[in-house]
Amino acid sequence: MNKVTTKTLFEKKQKGEKITMLTAYDYTFAKLFDSCMVDILLVGDSLGMVILGYDSTIPVTMEDMEHHVKAVARGTKYSMVVADMPFLSYHTTPEEAVRNAGRLIRAGAYAVKIEGCDDVIDKIEAVIKAQIPVMGHLGLTPQSVNVFGGYDLRAKEEKEAKKLIEDAKKLEEVGVFAIVLEKVPAMVAKQVQESVKVPIIGIGAGPYCDGQVLVCYDMLGMYEDFKPKFVKRYAEVGSIIKDAVSKYIDEVKRGEFPGKEHSY
């Protein structure tokens, strides 16, 4: 079982094989997903919401990301580990972007993911020149939520769609190995996918992308605060956990647990 690399992903796109990607934030989930042979595990700054309880990804720090990257990396043998670069970790200077990207690689990530294009393309290029693989992220970029005023659909208008395609080409030119495309119309995503050679991984971007990514807590039914239209719940693990905990509480209160089989 060979570990997934950037070459693996390029070959999948060329062969028309879909790429699978999920978020992971700890050793236990990473080990489970890795055993299922998920291609990419994203240590997303979404941990700010689903793990740390923030309202957005903006408060997440480099220290938060390093901590969770280390845990996920310990649980993977097959999956590529990609780490989000958090808010303000790459926005100031190319030098700081390289230093922070390096911290995440040393923590165990194979690559980093950076949101945006024009405002940060010099930073993306610097990180790639430092021999660190970069995954791009276009469309809805959650770290810019305060600028855009919400999590609305992007690239609805023709002008914005054309800009999205241009941005994808720019990112490809500077050397990103893949691009996440978030919350854009399916036909726009199809145009982007056909315009570049690098894999396009969609989240709320329709079926024409080269792969798909979801937040694991969303697709497992564990995060009830927010459920976007693009999320499919493959299980209701939250309900299973609640039922199990309620049963445990009941058995402890009634003196049924621990029984003889659980005692020494």
Swiss-Prot record:
It comes from Caldicellulosiruptor saccharolyticus (strain ATCC 43494 / DSM 8903 / Tp8T 6331). Its cofactor is Mg(2+). Binds 1 Mg(2+) ion per subunit. Belongs to the PanB family. GO terms for biological process: pantothenate biosynthetic process. This is 3-methyl-2-oxobutanoate hydroxymethyltransferase. Pfam families: Pantoate_transf. The keyword Heme does not apply. CDD domains: KPHMT-like (cd06557). 3-methyl-2-oxobutanoate binds at D45, S46, D84, K113. Homodecamer; pentamer of dimers.
